[in-house]
């Protein structure tokens, strides 16, 4: 074993809550308190050594009794905040991210993307800390730059502390709705049951020391040491971004979480069509801070990188590689088939292509695709097909096939991808819904709303084909015509009657309702309590087959009666249920 790496930390939260500013403040502490040659620069992430944290935090380390008890080398903060980076930090069976900071605006609480971030963190099972940011916005709060929160709160007026407590209380209440028990970090007694909330200010730096120390404590409590151990073998990593660089061609920014990557190595990763091979021509890393003289000359080529590292890979064959794809280095050509197999198996677990019923999912990266599918499954939504990239004509066909089994599955959910105009046109003409968005739970909420509308519409269509139960009584003194057709006044005792339904007496058919009139005007139906005139067509005469005062029932065919009883009973009113039960009893008696 080569040793223990630092945990990867991702910062997440709603837009404008101060994620980037918080990251800048954290990075600033490591720069200000670094020792010469201590800080290693990375592509896409920043290393904050534990020694720098100890120096920055000062007496708070002793107050929290952490001095000499922390064995992690430091933290590796992913430079790009947000759920996309978190999603792409994926590996088979879990997340490359070891810790997450959920940044919440203490003045406004959980918001849209904050909720999504929270659900993503929960779905991956990643330990997290909540930074209740914008502490400096609390009315009356007296700020001192970079002061630990525990020291700051002791120096405040009572009304500022009261306002803070009120805001934290509201946040705790909001979090409880998602099954999360939380409290201000210095009040947490059991970190296995409660999530710590650390009040911070990314503007003044207050609470940053507390945040870093709480992260250290959480990492040592929840991250097994074995997970942070790294070897000396071929590198394993994940692609975070693929782009074209002038003079270099297509490059991949990757995070190496185990092993070593060397110039000249063959790497196996993945694109839309499956596993891809590329030969490393150059490995690029940032120059050490003390060597950065010219802003234009910030990078240098290296012969190899060791985990954990963020590196830019220049290689032949990176075209079409997708972010979130695994990356395996191969040191022997004999190992190439096995590496391709491993990458292929991992991608096949993310991409879905089946003939089972379910929705169609499209996303922009392997990471976001995996997160989307995982989220949908947790919400009980089956997936028929899931792939990376914009929706295609084939997706529309698949959605049409899925709709045949369940109308609520005739949909394409598109996360952070553009919809080609020709595909959108075909979807519209085929009656396929495309729901596109950049916030996962918003897409899900829109899908739920749409699927409920589809379900309601489908049920309405089915119910419109079924005969609703009904029970009427011929009113004495209201016989207007005795035969051909019979016209009588009736009262609807239960259920519903409509033109076209057949009436029965004692289980035997007496005729069909031709028309219903209420106060001299034709109506399409009459419900319980209504008194109306009806015309009855059939071999029936008042005084023979029927008479004044008789009770008649709407005839419900046996198959439809079973449908009502075993599938759609909840859509019947109580009086309709009673009418159906009585009708079935009379039918049974008539056939005995």
UniProtKB/Swiss-Prot annotation:
Residues 201-203 are annotated as: G5. Residues 133-136 are annotated as: G4. Residues 13-20 are annotated as: G1. Residues 79-82 are annotated as: G3. Keywords: GTP-binding, Initiation factor, Nucleotide-binding, Protein biosynthesis. Signal peptide: none annotated. The keyword Nucleotide-binding applies. This is Probable translation initiation factor IF-2. Function in general translation initiation by promoting the binding of the formylmethionine-tRNA to ribosomes. Seems to function along with eIF-2.
């Amino acid at each position: 074993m080569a040793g223990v790496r630092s945990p990867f930390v991702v910062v997440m939260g709603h837009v404008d809550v101060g994620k980037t500013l918080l990251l800048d403040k954290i990075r600033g502490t490591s720069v200000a308190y670094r020792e010469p040659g201590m800080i290693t620069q990375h592509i896409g992430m920043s290393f904050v050594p534990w020694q720098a944290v100890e120096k920055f935090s000062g007496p708070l380390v002793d107050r929290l009794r952490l001095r000499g008890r922390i064995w992690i080398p430091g933290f590796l903060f992913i430079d790009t905040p947000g759920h996309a980076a978190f999603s792409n930090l994926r590996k088979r069976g879990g997340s490359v991210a070891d810790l997450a900071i959920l940044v919440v605006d203490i003045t406004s609480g959980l918001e849209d993307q904050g909720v999504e971030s929270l659900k993503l963190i929960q779905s991956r099972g990643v330990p997290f800390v909540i930074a209740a940011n914008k502490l400096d916005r609390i009315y009356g709060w007296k700020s001192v730059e970079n002061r630990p929160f525990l020291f700051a709160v002791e120096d405040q007026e009572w009304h500022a502390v009261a306002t803070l407590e009120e805001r934290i209380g509201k946040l705790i209440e909001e979090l409880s709705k998602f099954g999360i028990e939380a409290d201000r970090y210095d009040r947490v007694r059991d970190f296995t049951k409660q999530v710590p909330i650390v009040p911070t200010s990314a503007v003044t730096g207050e609470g940053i020391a507390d945040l870093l120390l709480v992260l250290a404590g959480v990492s040592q409590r929840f991250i097994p040491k074995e997970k942070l151990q790294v070897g000396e073998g071929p590198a394993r990593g994940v692609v975070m971004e693929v782009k074209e660089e002038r003079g270099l061609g297509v490059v991949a920014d990757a995070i190496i979480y185990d092993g070593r990557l060397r110039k000249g190595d063959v790497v196996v990763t993945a694109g839309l069509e499956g596993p891809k091979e590329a030969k490393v021509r150059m490995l690029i890393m940032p120059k050490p801070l003390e060597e950065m003289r010219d802003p234009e000359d910030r990078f240098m080529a290296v012969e190899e990188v060791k985990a954990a590292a963020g590196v830019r890979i220049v290689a032949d064959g990176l075209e079409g590689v997708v972010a979130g794809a695994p990356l395996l280095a191969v040191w022997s050509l004999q190992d190439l088939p096995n590496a391709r197999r491993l990458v292929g198996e991992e991608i096949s677990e993310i991409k879905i292509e089946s003939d089972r019923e379910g929705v169609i999912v499209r996303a922009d990266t392997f990471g976001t695709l995996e997160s989307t599918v995982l989220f949908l499954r947790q919400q009980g939504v089956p997936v028929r097909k899931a792939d990376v990239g914009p929706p295609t004509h084939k997706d529309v066909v698949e959605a049409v096939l899925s709709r045949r089994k369940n109308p609520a599955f005739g949909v394409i959910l598109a996360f952070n991808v553009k919809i080609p105009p020709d595909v959108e046109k075909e979807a519209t003409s085929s009656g396929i819904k495309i729901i596109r968005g950049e916030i996962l739970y918003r897409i899900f909420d829109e899908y739920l709303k749409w699927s409920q509308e589809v379900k309601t519409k489908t049920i309405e269509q089915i119910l419109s084909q079924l005969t609703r139960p009904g029970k009427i009584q011929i009113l004495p003194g209201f016989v207007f015509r005795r035969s051909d057709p019979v016209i009588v006044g009736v009262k609807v005792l239960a259920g519903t009657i409509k033109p076209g339904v057949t009436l029965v007496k004692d289980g035997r058919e007496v005729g069909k309702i031709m028309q219903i009139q209420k106060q001299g005007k034709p109506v399409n139906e009459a419900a319980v309590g209504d008194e109306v005139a009806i015309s009855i067509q059939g071999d029936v005469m008042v005084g023979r087959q029927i008479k004044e005062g008789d009770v008649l029932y709407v005839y419900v065919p046996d198959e439809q009666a079973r449908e009502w009883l075993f599938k759609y009973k909840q859509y019947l009113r109580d009086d309709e249920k009673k009418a159906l039960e009585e009708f079935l009893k009379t039918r049974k008696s008539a056939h005995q």
